[in-house]
């Protein structure tokens, strides 16, 4: 049957915040503490001096999966093995069903070689599972050193373990943004940070460059252990001057991290 992920999450949340009186939305409940899931020996210079790519690919279930448990399990196992053969790291599969009517599955891949990511994508589409999937959206991003703080690196390349939920979206800056003085952009982005991650330190962000890769300039992924934290940081960042310099920041794809087998168990069968 389908694992009780709600119960599992509740248990994890209770364990993390045992002994506190904070509400789920309070910032006291998410103080800056070292999370044992994360690496603490990350070399920022090494990360910045190498190329690191991510690929976010979203699919819809085009037709129902087989009703036979054995056949369905075989499809998932064989497809997963085939996709892993590309060599790309799979940061997560995400169930995005219900958040958008046209999407069901998001895959987040990581690698230092963009062609390896392409191979992983091709393999998924060519796999037994791929025959049931229709492409909806895909975007590749590249880590480039942050303009104002070289020690700010994407969570996905900075030793931060995957969280229970992910939100991915692209965005495009206004035409005049890049013509502003660097110190002015730094001031605006500092305020943006104070209204976002400073208030929600448990939310982990990965901002990657996408110039020339697609129709976007940047692609972002936020991760947290509960959905309300993702909503909170996005809402808080609306009250900043930086919002005046955004031309486009859709579509959004959001969902819980699941195994591919879990995802398949939730899908229609025929």
Residue positions per predicted region:
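Short linear/disordered segments characteristic of secreted peptide precursors
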Residues: 9-13
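Short S/T/G/P-rich N-terminal loop/turn motif that feeds into the first structured element of a domain
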Residues: 24-84, 112-117, 134-198, 211-213, ...
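Short, glycine- and small/hydrophobic-rich beta-strand elements in well-ordered beta-sheets
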Residues: 81-103, 130-145, 194-219, 233, ...
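Short amphipathic alpha-helices in soluble, non-transmembrane regions
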Residues: 119-127, 232-238
